[in-house]
């Protein structure tokens, strides 16, 4: 009981809850990895990879299972798209989810983005799903496109491995989305670019 009280007091002074402080002790002194530490390592690596591009602005809170990457569209009033990486809901088949969130009152932009999301699903069903050995269960809601992040098979993954795969995927999606919306890329151009990128990927997510 005395130990618990001391831990609670220390956690209070550090502005933390008891479980978070215990996890920190495990990581720093016993070298036991925790989900929070792994999420943090992945997000720090993504932040480092994304910062030089300036196309996507990363943000995450230490210990959080989610990270957001904000991108501005070349469209009237400069609407933004937010890519939310959520690693808290992974299972044996997935690492988590990628949520693509957009807010706009423009019916034309909503229609164009919906068209792109449907095109993306068609391309991945045709090109990626056979390589993964399973379908990709995407969902489109009002202002949100949700895509599960597949768990790569056959190897132990470091935080840098995961960060590299997620960063490359988000950058590809963002680049092709913008090209499709500004008219510089047709549906066939998007598919061709996707296929070319797929051939160079070391991890399939």
Place the predicted regions along the sequence by residue:
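Residue-level signal for alpha-helical context at structural boundaries
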Residues: 25, 39-40, 44, 187, ...
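Charged, low-complexity intrinsically disordered regulatory/assembly segments
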Residues: 103-205
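Short amphipathic alpha-helix starts
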Residues: 1-11, 26
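Short, basic amphipathic alpha-helical segments that act as recognition/interaction helices
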Residues: 16-39
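Amphipathic, interaction-prone secondary-structure segments
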Residues: 57-107
